[in-house]
């Protein structure tokens, strides 16, 4: 509902600021997105049954939430591999969230030389492929374990970004589409299996607490990644390909951190 309200506000503001046909296409896409958010939220309201909680207990926990982040980080150290996994997740979420924050679209136009329309089409293709990737990685995670699948996905991400740099440096246009396919497949994949990984490392009675840390790490990475990209591109003037390679370094750091974490659960969840 909140997302739909925000999209509606954006839609109204676009009506006010659109004096030519230049933004008509974007305006129509926002209208479609607004409707889809509402449509796909309906099953959650109709078919997902929530457990009833004692309001007094919930309110007490809410007041304690001011201290929960630091407390949870300290608590996570008591469980083997959990803190290390979260640190590793910060590095790969930093790289991936930097791309999906909108900087990839800029890269495709400014460095790869795609038109705005071609860029949108490639990103749309990547989104469709990500759905397939999520399903495939989910099945693979059940068979091979989330650790192996996470590491494999990180390796694919590194290859994907290196291919993007090669494509733009040597003007091999078709390679950028390979990047889109690999990246799309693995963005769906890594966010499918890393949740399973997280669950295996966390005791059932503290899942909510530690998933709060999981989310906090992702949000913090969303802030830090674009700042790093902007610093490399705009302050150091080293170019977008250097910024892209810096993301490869982040993924590599993440790979070696997570490689040392076992996905064998010590809990019966």
List the model feature ranges, each with a label.
Residues 8-35, 231-251:
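A membrane-interface helix-boundary motif in multi-pass transporters
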Residues 36-48, 245-269:
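Multi-pass alpha-helical transporter architecture, strongest
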Residues 51-86:
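Juxtamembrane intracellular "pre-TM" segments in multi-pass secondary transporters
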Residues 102-119:
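Short amphipathic helix-loop junctions that connect adjacent transmembrane helices
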Residues 133-146, 233:
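Helix-to-loop junctions at the C-terminal end of transmembrane segments
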Residues 143-155:
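Cytoplasmic membrane-interface "Motif A"-like loop-to-helix N-cap segments
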Residues 155-170:
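C-terminal ends and interior cores of transmembrane alpha-helices
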Residues 189-203:
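Intracellular juxtamembrane helix-capping segments at the cytosolic ends
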């Amino acid at each position: 509902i909140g997302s739909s309200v925000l999209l509606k506000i954006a839609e109204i503001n676009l009506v006010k600021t659109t004096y030519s046909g230049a933004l008509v296409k974007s305006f129509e896409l926002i209208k479609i997105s607004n409707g889809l958010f509402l449509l796909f939220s309906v099953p959650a309201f109709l078919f997902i049954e929530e457990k009833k909680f004692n309001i007094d207990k919930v309110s007490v926990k809410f007041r304690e939430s001011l201290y929960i982040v630091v407390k949870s980080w300290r608590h996570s150290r008591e469980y083997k591999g959990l803190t290390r996994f979260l640190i590793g997740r910060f590095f790969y979420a930093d790289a991936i969230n930097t791309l999906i924050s909108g900087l990839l679209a800029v890269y495709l136009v400014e460095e790869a030389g795609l038109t705005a329309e071609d860029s949108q089409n490639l990103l749309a293709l990547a989104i469709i492929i990500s759905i397939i990737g999520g399903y495939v990685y989910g099945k693979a995670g059940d068979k091979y374990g989330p650790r192996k699948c996470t590491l494999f996905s990180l390796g694919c991400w590194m290859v994907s970004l290196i291919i993007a740099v090669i494509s733009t440096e040597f003007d091999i246009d078709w390679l950028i589409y390979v990047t889109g396919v690999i990246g799309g497949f693995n963005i769906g994949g890594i966010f499918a299996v890393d949740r399973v990984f997280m669950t295996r490392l966390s005791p059932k009675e503290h899942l909510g607490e530690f998933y709060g840390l999981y989310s906090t790490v992702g949000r913090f990475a969303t802030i830090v990644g674009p700042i790093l990209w902007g610093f490399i591109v705009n302050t150091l003037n080293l170019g977008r390909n250097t910024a892209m390679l810096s993301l490869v370094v982040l993924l590599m750091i993440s790979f070696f951190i997570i490689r040392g974490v076992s996905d064998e659960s010590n809990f019966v969840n």
